[in-house]
Amino acid sequence: MIRANCRARFTAADFDFIVRTLARSRGDSVSLVDLLGDSETRDSILDHPRLVETILSNAGHLHISSQFYFYVLARYVLRQAGIGDRKLCDYVGSLLETFSRANQLQSPDKIDPPKDGFAGANNRAHEYISDMLIALTRATPEQTFLLRAHVGNYSLFISGIFHENTQRRSLRGAPDIEFYEKVGRSNYQLVASHETARRCELTDVFAGLASRFHDVRLALNELSDRLLHLDEDARPSLVL
């Protein structure tokens, strides 16, 4: 299950990257290390534009975690889109980190890595979205939550990262972007009121994703086109 926890999983290498990127002197390094111990100050530091610039200019040689990488980039494009909720940004970062692994491009009960990677998974997207929606008819309440959350997440990922591929396929009869927006939004709305969402402190995140699905999707389009180029199956490599 995806949670809004990228920031809680940053590594020592991530904090070292922040200090090395932002410190101008040895004294700055000491101050930054102290400041990073405070969560509010840390969040403010994570918004520094130099972090994004350094990540983008050294994408193939980064000694950072994938959760740090995707949080910083997701936060950047979402803020550009006027979405400032850090918890929502954290969730989207976790979503990108999770779905960037090929074996997570399928529903929870079908974890077999697609041999043709991202693009192949997009080609089959509408098939197992339909399968998951059908599975809801026989699911328990807990399974219903997990399935609906996954449908919302998957719809956002496909329409956000693979929007050009999705549009091309829609010309040949496959579901279009509007289909994924509608399905994603409605499933996020439904899970927002679920007890499991309250227990996991995700009610506000799901409600925010439902109400701003279109805006978040456009921000991910920007991320895919300008920063990641995942729509062309050119996944950036990280040295982890």
For each of these PLM feature ranges, what is it?
Residues M1-V239:
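Polar/charged low-complexity regulatory segments
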